[in-house]
Curated annotation (Swiss-Prot):
The keyword Hydrolase applies. This is Desumoylating isopeptidase 1 homolog. The active site is at 55, 133. Belongs to the DeSI family.
Amino acid sequence: MLTDLFYSTFGCLYSPTSTMDVMGTARRKTVVRLNVYDMYWLNDYASNIGVGIFHSGIEVFGVEYAYGGHPYQFSGVFENSPQDAEELGETFKFKESIVVGETERSTSDIRKLIKSLGEDFRGDRYHLISRNCNHFSAVLARELTGKDIPGWINRLANLSGSIPFLEKCIPQEWLTPIVLQASVDEKKRGSVDSAEEATEKLVVRSLNDSRTTILDNRTANGAIIMSASSSNSDRICMSPSSSSSASSCDTLDYDDLIVQTPSTFSSEKKSRSNSPPIFRIWNTIKATINGTQQTAPTGAATVIPASSASNIGKTNSTPGTTSNGLAKPTCSEC
């Protein structure tokens, strides 16, 4: 009586499409299907010897997972729309869908499983006889449901000794469905783009390191400091001198950059003449004659005392000349 009451009350929780986990909540089961495709015109010849050549994939949660070959060392497992032969190619024709069983795995669990199987079912390890799409379908179906797929799906592998030439007769595009080839091309483009981006970053970093090294070597004996950056122009900072504690900065272009060292400054000083400019000589002469204060362009003043100015024009030892060696003006010149 109590048992009947229990099942009448809670029997819905024990339906074929759900189970109970340890927490007492229902876990929904999902149907797992095996979709079979016929390589139709090749089977016209293979059927004469009692062997069919089929492609298969496992459908779960509205996605079909299958395996194909390519020459690269990464996964050959791919996804496609269930029962869509056009995504596979012209040589594929949908044949039938077979329910293998049910699974309690979630979508995230299945994706982890697919990724794990992809490490074993690599594209470059594909073999038409010993490691083909049907072998992958059998492994995935067993992992999800604990059941095997029908034996006739992969009969070709069991009779491979009878037709050793068959693999060479099948075109390569049959081993690599269109949807798998598109996935491979996309992954290759992504790898190339990543490699190019990494190379560009490496070149830029190398250039920046070179600029910094060169400028550090110049700064050891020079008067400027540069902060390296990735742009064409950088911050140029003048090192503070002994008389000034502040440093001035400016933004200059690399093409216009001229680094001056102390040796350059000293060579510039040596190249300059120590003799005063002509206008300073003329101002000195005028100040000497007039006995007035004259301000030089540099701000220094020259003062001629009046006592000294009174002696201007007196002869020294040579007639016709003044004490400073200048000729006396004649009457006509006056």
